[in-house]
Amino acid sequence: SFSVGVLTRAASDMGHAFPFGLSLLPNYSEFANLFDRYRLRRVDVRIAMVQKNNHTTSRFPTVWAYMDDDDASIPLTKNAVLERQSVRPFTFSDAKTVYSVSIQPRWLLDSTNKASLAPRDMWIDMSTPSVSHYGLKMWVDDYNSSYDSIISVDATIHFECQCVR
């Protein structure tokens, strides 16, 4: 489990993309010394509101999250996010401060060809731990509040290794 990032919102909305990979894990090289291959099975993502904006009349932020497994481009507009079929909204509140989602990220066999999605069960050589696995994109809508909200994004990567050295 590790922190993917902390988002501070102040008076603007913003898109985010989160590619995952073995190289993001602390001390991943320990596994590289022990095994020949790996594959990412699942990523559990926890999006939590650490600090709400402290103005009593301001609204809580809404996170619009969706699965996109062909690139790591950041969504540029809220409308582009809302056009996605699988988008899921989550509005934080005093009672709902955490949004959790589990994804199965994908990677491309050829990074220049978006049609080259690798099969989910395909093993990757340990010599390439920085292969990007695409999956989660989101838009944070802070309703143009002039007060800050802090949102943390944490991930737990579930992976398998094969062929002990």
Please give the residue ranges for each predicted region:
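Capsid-like jelly-roll
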Residues: 1-165
